[in-house]
């Protein structure tokens, strides 16, 4: 960033109240409110998830940074996160509902690059509950997410199963 010293004050003011945890550094594309190709409001989902994390008062490191794309175009790079969501829709009881496909165990770390594994579809309304359950599971383990996931590589998927449609 090319920021002069005299511009620092306004920049700090504009970013006040920004990300306070690793989870709040999560990535979301611009989403369907702006993007003509977007299917889901990825920014709106991320905002709901950050509100949930703050309400639950999870310690920093309990939830990982996640990646959210509002459609298959992957502008939110959902495939590279340990948890990623790709926007879509799912018919449930003959009603088309907002949904996201869940991807897990992706990585953009140099030397460990891999695409995440798609494990299923989750209704948008269920995603905060899924991540809340994950957060409590990690918190109750007495470790942070990285340590918990290293010891429980199937942990995310086993929690997610009950939220998939």
What is the role of each PLM region?
Residues 108-109, 138-165:
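Radical SAM enzyme core and accessory elements
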Residues 73, 81-83, 113, 143, ...:
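Flexible, active-site-adjacent loop/turn segments at secondary-structure boundaries
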Residues 1-7, 100-103, 156:
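Generic recognition of long tandem-repeat/solenoid scaffolds
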Residues 1-95:
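Small-residue-enriched alpha-helical segments and adjacent helix-cap loops
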């Amino acid at each position: 960033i090319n920021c002069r010293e005299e511009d620092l004050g306004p920049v700090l003011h504009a970013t006040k109240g920004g990300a306070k945890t690793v989870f709040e550094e999560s990535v979301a594309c611009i989403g369907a409110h702006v993007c003509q190709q977007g299917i889901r409001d990825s920014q709106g989902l991320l905002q709901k998830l950050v509100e949930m994390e703050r309400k639950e008062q999870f310690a920093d490191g309990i939830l990982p940074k996640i990646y959210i794309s509002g459609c298959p175009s992957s502008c939110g790079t959902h495939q590279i996160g340990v948890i990623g969501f790709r926007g879509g829709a799912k018919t449930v009881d003959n009603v088309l509902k907002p949904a996201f496909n869940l991807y897990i165990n992706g990585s953009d770390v140099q030397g460990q690059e891999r695409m995440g594994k798609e494990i299923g579809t989750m209704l948008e309304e269920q995603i905060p509950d899924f991540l809340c359950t994950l957060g409590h599971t990690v918190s109750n383990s007495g470790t942070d997410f990285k340590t918990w996931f290293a010891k429980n590589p199937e942990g995310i998927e086993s929690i997610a199963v009950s939220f998939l449609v």
